[in-house]
Amino acid sequence: MDGVGLCANNKQKQNQMLPNKMRGEFTRNQRKDSEGLSEAPDLEFEYSDADKWTAELSELYSYTEGPEFLLNRKCFEEDFHTHLPDQKWTELDSVQRRAHAMRLLDGLEVIGRERRLKVARAILYMAQGTFGECSSELEVQHWMRYNVFLLLDVGAFTALVELLNMEIDNSAACSSAVRKPAISLADSTDLRVLLNIMYLMVETIQREEPTDSPEWRTIRETFKSELGSPLYNHEPVSVMLFGMVTKFCSGHAPHFPMKKVLLLLWKTILFTLGGFEQLQSCKISRRAALGLPPLPEDSIRVVRSMRAASPPASASDLIEQQQRRARREHKALIKQDNLDTFNEKDPYKADDSHEDEEENDDNDNSLEAEPFPLERDEVMPPPIPHPPTERMCFPKGLPWAPKVREKDIESFLESSRSKFIGYTLGNDTDTVVGLPRPIHESIKTLKQHKYVSIAEVQIAKEEAFQKTPLSGGEEELELCATELLYQGILPSLPQYMIALLKILLAAAPTSKAKTDSINILADVLPEEMPTTVLQSMKLGVDVNRHKEIIVKAISAILLLLLKHFKLNHVYQFEYMAQHLVFANCIPLILKFFNQNIMSYITAKNSISALDFPHCVIHELPELTAESLEAGDNNQFCWRNLFSCINLLRILNKLTKWKHSRTMMLVVFKSAPILKRALKVKQAMMQLYVLKLLKVQTKYLGRQWRKGNMKTMSAIYQKVRHRLNDDWAYGNDLDARPWDFQAEECALRANIERFNSRRYDKNQSNPEFLPVDNCLQSVLGQRIDLPEDFQMNYDLWLEREVFSKPISWEELLQ
């Protein structure tokens, strides 16, 4: 009894030493989760532009749309057998298939909505691979590719864009949807069918296959250039889709199927601008064109070769380990002999002791461990050698080559000169007179690792254009897909960013339902709500999956735009980034990560039996509550891990080299949120978390750094080093009071000057416009005078010319 009372008193004292919030966490039973995390293997996740083709196809459809597959088939077969009785699509020759496809396209031009919808469903069935005549999923995929290229060749995409524009401008449908109290799947039928066909075409054509014929390759390149050019309604398709997003968020079109719009927008941007591999190759060629040295390494390859680090521990883990160890020591004093005898026979002893040792080894970095300084030697024992199979193999040396900016060299020289010789030389980075030999060596090392970014060259060129607008000459503007897209979205870019973040907020798992939030479930909720438990569970899975796909699409859209704009021109990137910051993107992403991120990544919100194309080939098994709860057998959810990495990369892009935005991370207390995300054992995700922790480390205080040494070691090991970057201490010159408004206003002024100079031709300074001073040229111009002026010409001549004294000598000089 005494022993029990002593343990209870110790436990009570330890609880009292904890902060209130942590005390609540400690009372929850988190042991199972934390132990599972510490023992969890690395997630075998390969980051890429998108998931497998079949996964991307299946995510287009909600499970509620399942019955429409057979409806599409029925519409196609009725029309097909009317013109070609007793024949199959797969048995026709290419001429017959082309003729039927063109016949269907003609049907899209009829006035009657019902007839037009039936034809659109028949075309959708073609794009879905005419699955009724296929016996396997591979066969469906084969006919999908064939039919989609055929549809594109006969001009289906242009017709679909025109129909989509007509549906967007359909005021009757919009006003009807606004008046409805509850919007369901039936309100967006026409839009969903059109968007489904367009998405299947873009998604299928953008994926190259080794077996593609030269004709298909030519069609793909032509489609890619047309999709990124203002050929459809005098604007790129992406701009039209952005317009749908803002119209939906403004409440004027609540029936728009937003998941499909966002997926099509993402794939259109991905296809026209290029993915991450193309970005890397474009960056290499752009640096070569500017005369800059090549990149020190291939960042994509380096990240793929990295291994995940062990996750840091939480306070509850540390305390439970101490209690467990105290209990073991107490038992050892009472029954040492009996325990020795038992341990000889205990088959789990080795595993248990190894588990404790490994946890102790992992849990040496928590700030919350500070209230127990006397027990630090117990909390942090010497490292235990791991078995060879579990040892993490790092390449010799650090994965990244260090980089130095010109600004870093200047500041180092300035501080050295003022310290040793008492004067400064401004921006001079060559004069080293009077400085000691070690400083010479330091400068030499810094210059060896000097890195000039494309952005620095672009900023310097822009400054030159602003300083010398006349002698600077005309800027050579390459009208690539990125430039055309920026010109298209520039007038309404702030509204587009706000709309995307609104939808992201509504789809985030941490968001609570509010009356003023937008309804993003219009294209997933059925007309009749479920009546059984099984139907409710299925709809719950569908809704969660729907939200996850929306988060995935928005995160990919934002990241692709930021990266492409930064490569095209840094001020395009800064314009978009600044509006994201003004729309509270930073706290929104932090709010997203302020959840059990491991549960989000391992969520099983999918029913593989209902995924396309599996559901149209195989018979649907009987769904039970147990099978819905079990989900699939995957270690993690690809789309959720993809979304998390994208959001971290966006956060990193917004805050990089921005002191005021880095301080926002500190003010919003992002460190504990980000530290929890390190529990996900995936190298790329950990890298971007560590980058975000690194930039704010010097502002978090000595106590935080002291209590998080394992995190500091991981930063040193995985994040690129900037020579002279005093990130691990608070001595940096940047650790100063910050003025968010001043920094952002200065940046905004530069952005506005850039946009005004390059895109606002009407607002050009009249002083710099060309003037025709030749008298003969001016008098020789033909000017059309209005009819009333010609009738009253004599009056004008008398009033304005004859009655006023004119010095013709001065005028002609």
Curated annotation (Swiss-Prot):
Please give the residue ranges the record annotates as the region Disordered. 1-41, 307-379
GO BP annotations of the record are: cortical actin cytoskeleton organization; cytoskeleton organization; heart contraction; regulation of cell morphogenesis
- On the tree of life, the source organism's domain of life is Eukaryota
Residues the record lists as Phosphoserine modifications: 310
Has keyword Oxidoreductase? no
Q: Where is the composition biased (Polar residues)?
A: 9-18
Q: Where in the cell is it found?
A: Cytoplasm
Q: Where is the composition biased (Acidic residues)?
A: 353-367
Q: Where is the composition biased (Low complexity)?
A: 307-316
Q: Where is the composition biased (Basic and acidic residues)?
A: 22-35, 331-352
Q: Which InterPro entries match?
A: Far11/STRP (IPR040185), Far11/STRP_C (IPR021819), Far11/STRP_N (IPR012486)
- State the similarity comment: Belongs to the STRIP family.
Q: What does the UniProt function comment say about this protein? A: Plays a role in the regulation of cell morphology and cytoskeletal organization. Required in the cortical actin filament dynamics and cell shape. Part of the striatin-interacting phosphatase and kinase (STRIPAK) complexes. STRIPAK complexes have critical roles in protein (de)phosphorylation and are regulators of multiple signaling pathways including Hippo, MAPK, nuclear receptor and cytoskeleton remodeling. Different types of STRIPAK complexes are involved in a variety of biological processes such as cell growth, differentiation, apoptosis, metabolism and immune regulation.
Q: What's the name of the protein? A: Striatin-interacting protein 1 homolog
Q: Which organism is it from?
A: Danio rerio
